[in-house]
Amino acid sequence: MNNSIISSVINSIDSSSKRTNIFSFDVQQPTAYMPQYISVNGYHNKKDNDANQVCSVSFDIRDQHIAAINYFFISIQLPEVSGEGKFAYVPYVGYKCIQHVAITCGDITIWETDGEELFDKCVDDKIASLSGYSPELNDISTGYTPNDTIKDPTTLYVYIKSPFDADKTISSLKLVNNKITVTITFRSINDVIVYDSKFQVERFVKDFVYSTELHLIAYAVSDIKPKSAYIELDRRVVSCSSTPTPIPVISDVYACTAMSVYVKPYYGMMENKFISYPGYKQTESDYVRCMVNRLLDDLVVVADTVPKGFPSTATFVKVPVDGQINLQDVDIIVKIDNVPDDKDIYYHTNLLIFGTRKNSFVYNISKKFSSIIGMYSPNTDSINFSKVNHTISITDASIPVSFWVSQKNVYQGDNRSNYSKSKDLVVNDPFRKGIDMVNKTDVISRLEVRFGNDPIYSEISPITKVFNMLLTGSSINMRKIIFNMNPANIFRPTTLNANTKRGKDKLTVRISYIDTDPNNPIHYVAKQLVVICTDLYRIDYDGNINITKITE
């Protein structure tokens, strides 16, 4: 740059103005402290021996040399799994086996969270993979004899993200000579596993015991001088699954920093069995590919006569030499090479069908294939498929087996072979959202939020979902309205404040679900609307730890 320009800029500066040095700064002397990695053994609070009941483990933290704590995580020991059958843990099994977390001081609850909300806040962190996201745990493994090892023992590490981690030492929880108790409530292990009919799940669940340890960072501080701080706690309201248009109401909303809305599927008994499951990799294409591979074994069969081992309601057509068949209004091409002269190719015309009325539209999976090309192997009596064109979708892969044979279906819906049915898998995942396996289908067509009687927000496009991803970096398909964007621990969080005189102390959410075809089984997945209100609290340290809900 020209020297004359530089000189003119420097000489024009008013030397009498007070300015901050941006090329160096005075280093301040911090409070003297020493961080420590602490591990704490817990004790079980379970009152009975029923393996299907929840189990609580508590950890007490009290030490005269510890002044503050944060960064909690737990380690969970998973035992060796042995026996016959197919078995896997769902991804992030460490988080998904947690039902509730609470940090208390005597009778005072300092902070608590539901397991699903904890998972949603942590799943995008790299450390979440340590909670049980790996091919070794999530891929389906098979045992062929009672002594076979299906899964090796391993240890999970689950980070319990809390408000006390927001700004390291500043946001830490100060003990002020109090005993702090961290209580983890676990689900039954049956709620987070995948297995087939051969696996002895009752024995596995009965023998399983949660073996866990709490780990945290503790600070030995010379003179801590704790000051009041603000923390946020989530409140969760779940609507009834039988309500077609739920209108959940959250009362006592005095200072709200955020509100979230999402939809969960509700599966009744025997509705959690599925035809296919991809395992570790669970993208949309993985689910679809796995579903197609399962269907093809029954869809195209090479045999010397009409295929056996199928229900009496199953129908087949013999594929002609040119490979072209017509299934009602759909043309399908089937080309299988190397078929012996004494055998024919058969196409299953009603593999999976669903309809609510006779002689009307029928949802037929067999009609979703347009061309199938492969080669038959006489040695293995199987077909190696090289190219398959189809319109199988993620919703098809997300239909529970029981829906095909439900009373709503006027047809015998599941006409697969007995061998194929024996491969079906029970998939228990308590944190599933939406009506399909990857939460792709946005089932909310309209959202309206009222504060008291006044509407404060309305949308027909998922704008709040996009802003949630933009502002929080979350990959969860969830709609969220955020009222606070202030830096943590520097300013009081901005809130939606109540006006009790005008009746503004409750949030009402009205939603409309999208229209789905009643002839598609996915239409009958029961839905639960979940609304989360994030309330603002103040934590005070005056010899004890006190938590106060902000009401102004």
Curated annotation (Swiss-Prot):
<comment type="subunit">
    <text>Homotrimer. Self-assembles to form a layer. Interacts with A17 (via N-terminus); this interaction is necessary for D13 association with membranes.</text>
</comment>
<dbReference type="Pfam" id="PF03340">
    <property type="entry name" value="Pox_Rif"/>
</dbReference>
<keyword id="KW-0472">Membrane</keyword>
<comment type="similarity">
    <text>Belongs to the poxviridae protein D13 family.</text>
</comment>
<protein>
    <recommendedName>
        <fullName>Scaffold protein</fullName>
    </recommendedName>
</protein>
<dbReference type="GO" id="GO:0046677">
    <property type="term" value="P:response to antibiotic"/>
</dbReference>
<dbReference type="InterPro" id="IPR005008">
    <property type="entry name" value="Poxvirus_Rif-R"/>
</dbReference>
<comment type="function">
    <text>Scaffold protein which forms a transitory spherical honeycomb lattice providing curvature and rigidity to the convex membrane of crescent and immature virions (IV). This association occurs concomitantly with viral membrane formation. Targeted by the drug rifampicin, which prevents the formation of this lattice, and hence virus morphogenesis. In the presence of rifampicin, irregularly shaped membranes that lack the honeycomb layer accumulate around areas of electron-dense viroplasm.</text>
</comment>
<dbReference type="GO" id="GO:0016020">
    <property type="term" value="C:membrane"/>
</dbReference>
